[in-house]
């Protein structure tokens, strides 16, 4: 396994859970055509998982954006795909996106996307 992270916060415990998980679902709002900084930081902080032979195989992404352009998700999807490519056994198997989500509760009006996410979750 890799060296312990010198930062003392809850990231190490989260990474331990990621390593032990059968599947991982990441959710993020899209800011400036990219995943939220907190998600990117978690992916970066998961570096010790690389040497840990993680259990997870399937990786999922759920993302919302205020923008109406479906390409708003390309950066986040590519970033998560790149992270997953570092783990031989992992694959990005599901992505659900919702455009026009710009306020608290706005996703509730996006029944198609909510149902797609629910169905994807039932398949895990």
Predicted regions located by residue number:
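Glycine-rich phosphate/pyrophosphate-binding loop and the adjoining helix
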Residues: 85-124
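Short cysteine clusters
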Residues: 1, 5
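Helix-loop-strand module that forms the ligand-binding subsite of alpha/beta enzymes
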Residues: 6-88
């Amino acid at each position: 396994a890799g060296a312990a992270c010198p930062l003392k916060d809850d990231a190490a415990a989260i990474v331990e859970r990621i390593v032990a998980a059968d599947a991982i679902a990441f959710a993020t709002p899209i800011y400036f055509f990219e995943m939220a900084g907190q998600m990117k930081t978690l992916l970066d902080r998961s570096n010790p998982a690389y040497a840990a032979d993680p259990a997870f195989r399937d990786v999922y992404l759920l993302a919302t954006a205020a923008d109406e352009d479906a390409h708003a998700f390309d950066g986040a999807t590519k970033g998560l795909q790149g992270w997953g490519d570092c783990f031989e056994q992992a694959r990005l198997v599901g992505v659900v996106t919702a455009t026009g989500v710009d306020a608290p509760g706005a996703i509730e009006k996006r029944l198609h996307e909510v149902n797609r996410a629910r169905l994807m979750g039932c398949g895990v």
